[in-house]
A protein has these predicted regions:
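Active-site neighborhoods and metal-handling regions in enzymes and metal-associated proteins
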Residues: 1-179
Length: 179
């Protein structure tokens, strides 16, 4: 299998080839161009030569790029080859939570509307939502307001207005919400 360091090298080369800067590289001492989180690692995994992807693994690859002075941040979860039905369901539900969160992000709605929609869907499917980490605004800085929690109550939190740019990055767990 491929190492997570191999993924990092691909991300670095692709980003540079397209005129971007890997924003995580050197950010607060982070040593790589992306985060690679395998299986029980929820996020911010550091790519290295020793983490070799194997059949049945789940991996999340989180890339943040600076292009023309602006930050963009995206992550995606994948399964490696065949895996268990429970892991397949986790990956599917996490993607659905992202889509549901995006649908809930409406002008003049609230940040809490996003978190409420995500948490409701995750719980309905037997999963929990990480509470210690959240999405965030992006733009001329890596992390800006608002914090976008992936749990919450409708009608609470910051008012969403046209032109806001932020990430929705639901982290969905089997078992409890704790990291």
């Amino acid at each position: 299998g491929m190492s997570t360091l191999g993924i990092d090298k691909l991300v670095y080369e692709y980003t540079k080839d397209h005129g971007g800067i890997p924003a995580t590289l050197g950010y607060e001492g982070f040593p790589k161009s992306c985060c690679t989180s395998i299986n029980e690692v929820v996020c911010h995994g550091i790519p290295n030569e020793f983490d070799i992807l194997e059949e049945g693994d789940i991996i999340n690859v989180d890339c943040t790029t600076i292009l023309d002075g602006y930050y963009a941040d995206a992550s995606r979860m994948f399964t490696i080859g065949k895996t268990t039905p429970q892991k397949e369901k986790l990956v599917r539900v996490a993607k659905e939570c992202l889509e549901i969160g995006m649908e809930a992000a409406k002008p003049f709605g609230f940040v809490g509307d996003i978190g409420h929609a995500i948490e409701k869907h995750a719980k309905k499917n037997g999963f929990s939502v990480v509470r210690d980490l959240c999405g965030h605004g992006v733009g001329i800085e890596f992390h800006e307001e608002p914090d976008v929690e992936h749990f919450g109550k409708k009608g609470t939190g910051m008012l969403l207005v046209p032109g806001m740019v932020f990430t929705i990055e639901p982290m969905i767990n089997m078992g409890t919400w704790e990291v």
